[in-house]
UniProtKB/Swiss-Prot annotation:
InterPro entries membership: RNA_methyltr_RlmE, RNA_MeTrfase_FtsJ_dom, rRNA-MeTfrase_E, rRNA_MeTrfase_gammaproteobac, SAM-dependent_MTases_sf
Recorded family membership: Belongs to the class I-like SAM-binding methyltransferase superfamily. RNA methyltransferase RlmE family.
Protein name, as recorded: Ribosomal RNA large subunit methyltransferase E
Domain of life: Bacteria
Residues forming the catalytic site: K164
Amino acid sequence: MATKKRSASSSRWLQEHFSDKYVQQAQKKGLRSRAWFKLDEIQQSDKLFRPGMTVVDLGAAPGGWSQYVATQIGGKGRIIACDILPMDPMVGVDFLQGDFREPLVLQALLERVGEQKVQVVVSDMAPNMSGTPAVDIPKSMYLVELALDMCRDVLAPGGNFLVKVFQGEGFDEYLREIRSLFTKVKIRKPDASRARSREVYIVATGRKL
């Protein structure tokens, strides 16, 4: 019975995925993922990126966000990306494959960033989901805390932070923590984000000194 349930669930997901208008548009435009549209909507409202910026992209694979950011920061900008999964090379993107939770990977990422502070940190990281919130939410919150720690290390004063968060236990505390570090904080649910998903995006601008 369990196998049948998993099979039915997988079939529903595949049907939903391939009938999704954003998946279809991404395929037509040659984009790496539908996440491109989420970031485009956020950029239209919040103007996180400008030409020449240096951006850190956490949870980057397959590259939808890096692909979008590259169009906004131009040839003089720089993207340092990291993911546990592989990602095909992209012009203007310095990609590190590894588990961001491991100290050696984090150190390698910091070395790639170098001495200069960055203007934006974005995180689309998410754990492998089990479907059980009591298991998934703590794993997700651990990742977003690490992303915020990265901001503390590398984000310049006045810099911006965008992070995907799954609503649940720990969300309100995390939001308060971000508000203490940034001058303006908003919560976004882009149209391209599936309605049934717990995910929202916290947009934090103007890192405080």
